[in-house]
Regions:
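Glycine-rich phosphate/adenylate-binding loop and adjacent beta-alpha elements
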Residues: 1-51
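Short glycine-centered segments of the SAM/dcSAM-binding site in methyltransferase folds
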Residues: 2, 87, 175-176
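Redox-cofactor binding/interface segments in oxidoreductases and associated redox assembly factors
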Residues: 5, 90, 156
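Glycine/Thr-rich phosphate-binding loops of Rossmann-like dinucleotide-binding domains
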Residues: 13, 98, 164-165
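Glycine/charged-rich beta-loop-alpha catalytic/anionic-binding loops adjacent to active sites
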Residues: 50-61, 149
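Mid-domain Rossmann-like dinucleotide-binding core that forms the NAD(H)/NADP(H) cofactor-binding site
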Residues: 58-139
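Glycine-rich cofactor phosphate-binding loops and adjacent beta1-alpha1 units
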Residues: 80-82, 128-178
Length: 178
């Protein structure tokens, strides 16, 4: 059978986070390519709990988006509680960032995704493929243009210290950073 895999190769099933179903936050978690040998090989040994059958009729290319879609969905839908009319800024136009932008827009939020000039091809995917507003400059202006307080939600999909600093600067009081 064709399958897709989760990335949590090793978890502590008895940890408090794993027991509540949040094994992705287990402090002892090791992922493929990070703590455990990666999967860029012909064969890889994967725990059965990580595997999910690809339904008939779903292409491998589409199925390959399962894990990043789940990460983005969890961040935006489960954790950010985005509502229609919110203003959301996504930092980082990689696959997960673009998918976060999609789920944010799908939730009814006015959404912009931020990248560097060197991210032009990724920003083009966000703009053309997902109809997201893209920014390489004017980020502060966009964040503060409505009422001067900042955006409701910042999704940090870049994961570097500079993006966290920017998120803190741009989120409104009582806003959310994920």
């Amino acid at each position: 059978d064709a399958v897709v895999s989760e990335t949590a190769a090793i978890i502590n099933a008895d940890s408090p986070m794993s027991r509540t179903g949040l094994y992705n936050l287990d402090k002892d978690r090791k992922g493929f390519g990070y703590g455990v040998n990666g999967a860029m090989t012909q064969f890889v040994k994967v725990p059965s709990r990580c595997l999910h059958r690809i339904p008939e009729g779903v292409s491998i290319e589409k199925a390959a988006l399962t894990e990043p879609c789940c990460v983005a969905y969890n961040a935006v839908i489960n954790n950010a509680s985005i509502k229609p009319g919110d203003r959301v800024l996504v930092l980082g136009p990689g696959p997960i960032g673009i998918l976060c932008g999609f789920f944010s827009k799908f939730s009814g939020a006015e959404t912009a995704i931020v990248g560097l000039e060197s991210d032009s091809s990724r920003l083009e995917v966000a703009r053309q493929g997902y109809e997201l507003k893209t920014l390489t400059e004017g980020v502060n202006e966009w964040a503060y243009e409505i009422d001067g307080l900042g955006v409701d939600v910042v999704v940090d999909a870049a994961g570097v210290s500079e993006s966290l600093k920017l998120a803190i600067e741009l989120v409104r009081p009582n806003g959310t950073i994920v």
